[in-house]
Amino acid sequence: MRILVIGSGAREHAIIKALHTDPRVTALYALPGNAGMAEAICLPGDPMDNALVVQQALEERIDFCIVTPDDPLANGLVDALEAAGVACFGPTQAAAQIEASKVFAKELMRKYGIPTAGFAVAHSFDEGMKALQSMPCPVVVKADGLAKGKGVL
């Protein structure tokens, strides 16, 4: 099986290390990868460029692609690869919304009665200030969108 792992971080490094020991894996690629991923052939390119990743996957005859970084998931990379016939591990763009959008996640929890801290959505600074003044402290302020584990005020 020919496998492509998207990303260049520690998580992807661990996945490549594990896959390298599996005798069913006949070729292992990373895009973009890094110098520490000696077990994989690192392909050049931006994992946010869906067309490029699909092209690389088709050229290398990839059987299975693992997509774990948040940005390519939110950008719809799994959708693009699957549309081209490449099987993937990773959520679709729609499913990745739960991580990519704090507003989506909080509204989903509210809709289905999943316990979560109270929240307000503000679309301007003034709306945000009004919401803050109406809430008891402590308060967490977070922008909608991906923040790589950061972004809390």
Predicted feature descriptions by range:
Residues 38-41, 97-103:
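Short, charged, surface-exposed secondary-structure boundary motifs
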